[in-house]
C-alpha cells in the first residue's frame, strides 16, 4: 500500500511519545529510577497501550514512564537520536518530530532550554548517521498552563533557527486555544509555521479557533471536523491540512473503530489529509502498520492511500525546493 516511488513522511510524530521500552529499562537502571517492572515483557503493559483507553487524558498517562527516566540532558539526547534511528528503520524519508521540553524536563527539573538544545543535538546526529531528513516542531503543553507554556516558548525562541513550527497539545477541553493567543503571535513573528492539536477531544469549534485565532496552517487529528460541513469546505478550499493518526484515535477512544474514522470522508471531500503515527512507542505501531493495516481497515482505497502519502509531503513544512529535491532523491532510487 506504500508507493515506494514517493517520499514516505510522518509529520505528526511525538518524540517524547516514542521512547523505546528497552531504553526506558536501561535509563531506569542507569539512573537508579524505580520502574513498575524490571523486564521488557512486564514493563510493556505500563508503557504501551494494550487495550483502548477511555479518553485522551488516560492515554497520555502511558507516556509518563518514558519521560520519568529522562534524568539528564544526555538521556534526552539519546532518545532524540533513537527517534531518528527508528524513523530510518521504518523507511521514512522525512519526519517532523514534535516535543514538549517542559514535559521532558519535569520529572528531574532539567533546564527547559537545555532539553531543547539536547533534542536538537540528538536529532542532528541521527540525521547525519541515518540519512533521514527531519525538522523539529516545538510543543507547548497546554495542560501545564499559560506560564509553563511561556517558558517552553522562550526555550524554543532561544533556538529559533532549529525550530520549524509551534504546536499546542494536551488537555484540549480544559485549556482551550484562546488562552494562548499571545504565544502564537510571537511564534508567527519568529517566522514559524503553526500546527495545533484540535478537534480530537473537543468539537469543531476548537478547529475553527485554531485556524482563526492561532493561525493554524495544519490541524493535528481534527477528527471532529466531520461534524461541521462548512468547516470541511473551508479546510478543502484553504488547503489547511489534517494530520490524521488512525490507530491513535482508536486507542484514545476519540473514534470507536477504524471503519468509522473520518479520514476517508476527508479525502473524498478534497481535504489535504495525511497518514501519521502520533506516539508510535506508546501505541506499539509504526508508519508501515498505519499504511498497510490501519488505512485499509479505515476503508481507504489503494488510490486514497497513495493520495494521503502525496499529501504528507505537500503538507510538510518544507520549501517547494526541498520538496522537489526529496521527490527526486526518492525517484532516483
UniProtKB/Swiss-Prot annotation:
Transmembrane segments: none annotated. It holds the Pfam family A_deaminase. Binds 1 zinc ion per subunit. The keyword Oxidoreductase does not apply. GO terms for biological process: adenosine catabolic process; hypoxanthine salvage; inosine biosynthetic process; nucleotide metabolic process; purine ribonucleoside monophosphate biosynthetic process. Its EC number is 3.5.4.4. Gene3D superfamilies: Metal-dependent hydrolases. It catalyses: adenosine + H2O + H(+) = inosine + NH4(+); 2'-deoxyadenosine + H2O + H(+) = 2'-deoxyinosine + NH4(+). Zn(2+) binds at residues 12, 14, 197, 278. The active site is at residue 200. InterPro entries: A/AMP_deam_AS (IPR006650), A_deaminase (IPR028893), A_deaminase_dom (IPR001365), Ado/ade_deaminase (IPR006330), Metal_Hydrolase (IPR032466). Keywords: Hydrolase, Metal-binding, Nucleotide metabolism, Zinc. GO terms for cellular component: cytosol. The record marks 221 as: Important for catalytic activity. GO terms for molecular function: 2'-deoxyadenosine deaminase activity; adenosine deaminase activity; zinc ion binding. Coiled coil: none annotated. The keyword Magnesium does not apply. Substrate binds at residues 14, 16, 170, 279. Signal peptide: none annotated. Its cofactor is Zn(2+). Belongs to the metallo-dependent hydrolases superfamily. Adenosine and AMP deaminases family. Adenosine deaminase subfamily. PANTHER family: ADENOSINE DEAMINASE (PTHR11409:SF43). Catalyzes the hydrolytic deamination of adenosine and 2-deoxyadenosine. This is Adenosine deaminase.
Amino acid at each position: 500500500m506504500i508507493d515506494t516511488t514517493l517520499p514516505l513522511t510522518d509529520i505528526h510524530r511525538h518524540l517524547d511519545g516514542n521512547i523505546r521500552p528497552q531504553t526506558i529499562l536501561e535509563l531506569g537502571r542507569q539512573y537508579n529510577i524505580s520502574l513498575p517492572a524490571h523486564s521488557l515483557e512486564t514493563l510493556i503493559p505500563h508503557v504501551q497501550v494494550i487495550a483502548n483507553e477511555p479518553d485522551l487524558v488516560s492515554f497520555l498517562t502511558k507516556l509518563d514512564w518514558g519521560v520519568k527516566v529522562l534524568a539528564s540532558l544526555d538521556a534526552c539526547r539519546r532518545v532524540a537520536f533513537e527517534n531518528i534511528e527508528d524513523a530510518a528503520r521504518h523507511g521514512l524519508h522525512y519526519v517532523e518530530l514534535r516535543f514538549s521540553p517542559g514535559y521532558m524536563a519535569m520529572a528531574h527539573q532539567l533546564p527547559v532550554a537545555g532539553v531543547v538544545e539536547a533534542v536538537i543535538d540528538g536529532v542532528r546526529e541521527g540525521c547525519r548517521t541515518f540519512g533521514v531528513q527531519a525538522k523539529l516542531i516545538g510543543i507547548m503543553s497546554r495542560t501545564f498552563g499559560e506560564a509553563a507554556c511561556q517558558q517552553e516558548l522562550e526555550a524554543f525562541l532561544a533556538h529559533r533557527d532549529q525550530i520549524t513550527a509551534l504546536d499546542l497539545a494536551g488537555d484540549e477541553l480544559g485549556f482551550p486555544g484562546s488562552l494562548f493567543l499571545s504565544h502564537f503571535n510571537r511564534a508567527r513573528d519568529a517566522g514559524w509555521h503553526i500546527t495545533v492539536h484540535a478537534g480530537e477531544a473537543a468539537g469543531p469549534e476548537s478547529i475553527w479557533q485554531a485556524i482563526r485565532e492561532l493561525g493554524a496552517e495544519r490541524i493535528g487529528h481534527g477528527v471532529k471536523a466531520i461534524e461541521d460541513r462548512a468547516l470541511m469546505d473551508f479546510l478543502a478550499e484553504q488547503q489547511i491540512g489534517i494530520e490524521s493518526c488512525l490507530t491513535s484515535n482508536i486507542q484514545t477512544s476519540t473514534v470507536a473503530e477504524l471503519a468509522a474514522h473520518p479520514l476517508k470522508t476527508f479525502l473524498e471531500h478534497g481535504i489535504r489529509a495525511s497518514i501519521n503515527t502520533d506516539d508510535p512507542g506508546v501505541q506499539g505501531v509504526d508508519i508501515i502498520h498505519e499504511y498497510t493495516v490501519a488505512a485499509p481497515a479505515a476503508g481507504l482505497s489503494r488510490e486514497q492511500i497513495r493520495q494521503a502519502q502525496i499529501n504528507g509531503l505537500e503538507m510538510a513544512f518544507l520549501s517547494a525546493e526541498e520538496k522537489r529535491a526529496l521527490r527526486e532523491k526518492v525517484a532516483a532510487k
